[in-house]
């Protein structure tokens, strides 16, 4: 009902589900990472899971159904999963990015063309992965996917000058 109420007031609504870590220390979701190498593809498939598993896929599809039923304007299929999107398989590919592309297609099938879809990269993730002397723009295939409508970047700029003193 809230989405419909906000829309009735002339506002646009984007659903932005967050993954919070429910373990001691409550680490940032961007620290969840796979292990580079031969097992990375299977590992990312397990993290995303199926539509009825308790993985990222089930969560995103749940919110896609809400977006479709309630008339949301947009849906972020994930956010700040830097550790996952940087994980590389044995061939140097990025299996979590492949999973997000598949997930975008699955969400598109639920919400249709009228709901804008994207993945919100962390400010330290969006510009690529820098390692072993190379820069790889790992998210480009996701953002260029026909099921993704725009580039989204989470950025938390300071609202005030936090330094002490005048000036």
Q: Where are the regions that the model predicts?
A:
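Substrate-binding cleft and catalytic face of glycoside hydrolase catalytic domains
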Residues: 1-89, 110-119, 123-124
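Glycoside hydrolase catalytic-domain groove-lining segments
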Residues: 98, 102-118, 141, 145-167
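Short, flexible/disordered intra-domain loops and linkers
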Residues: 29-35, 86-95, 129-135, 165
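Alpha-helical scaffolding within the catalytic cores
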Residues: 59-63, 131-141
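Intrinsically disordered, low-complexity regions
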Residues: 3, 41, 128, 133-136, ...
């Amino acid at each position: 009902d809230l989405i419909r109420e906000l829309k009735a007031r002339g506002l646009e609504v984007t659903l932005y589900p967050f993954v919070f870590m429910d373990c001691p220390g409550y680490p940032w979701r961007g620290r969840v990472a796979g292990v580079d190498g031969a097992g990375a593809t299977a590992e990312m498939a397990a993290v995303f899971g199926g539509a009825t598993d308790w993985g990222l896929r089930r969560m995103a599809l749940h919110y896609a159904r809400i977006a479709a039923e309630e008339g949301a304007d947009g849906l972020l299929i994930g956010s700040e999963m830097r550790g996952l999107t940087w994980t590389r398989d044995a061939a140097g590919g990025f299996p979590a990015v492949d999973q997000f592309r598949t997930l975008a297609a699955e969400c598109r099938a639920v919400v249709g063309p009228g709901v804008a879809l994207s993945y919100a990269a962390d400010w330290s993730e969006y510009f690529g992965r820098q390692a072993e002397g190379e820069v790889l723009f790992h998210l480009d295939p996701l953002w260029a996917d026909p099921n993704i409508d725009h580039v989204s970047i989470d950025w938390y700029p300071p609202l005030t000058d936090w330094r002490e003193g005048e000036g």
